[in-house]
Amino acid sequence: MAFWNEKTLAQMSTQEWESLCDGCGKCCLNKLIDDETEQLYYTNAACLLLDNKAGHCQNYEQRFSFVPSCTKVTVDNIESLTWLPDSCAYRRLFMGRELPTWHPLRTGSKEAMILAGMSVAGKVTCETKIRDIEDHIVLWPMKDVE
């Protein structure tokens, strides 16, 4: 049986916890909240550390030094990180859901994730090149497939 089915999030080792991240890059997208409706919107404006072609952080180990606003997902804050997409493994497991069939832990590679359209790779622009972020609102990051 897979470790994510045997253990709670709190019981996982650091290595197990880190391996839950599928590397989709959706958490690295700039998000907007409508002041009137409090609706969350994703944009295709990505963190300056995100490799736009590969869809992952270019300096993951030192990301907090370069981007102090970067959020570290932990067992202690997962409940409050409601902005994480429903496809996020941390969020899915916290909500009592299974990892999707395309998840790298289940398939052995990121290829199925990319084919399922779950990665930001090739779909984003660096935030430093964006002028009017409202023009970059997108719906695809909210997509969740089993």
Swiss-Prot record:
Pfam family of the protein (one): CxxCxxCC
Record-annotated disulphide pairs: none
Family from the record: Belongs to the UPF0260 family.
Family matches, as HAMAP family: UPF0260
PANTHER family on file: UPF0260 PROTEIN YCGN (PTHR37421:SF1)
Entry protein name: UPF0260 protein Shal_1839
Species annotation: Shewanella halifaxensis (strain HAW-EB4)
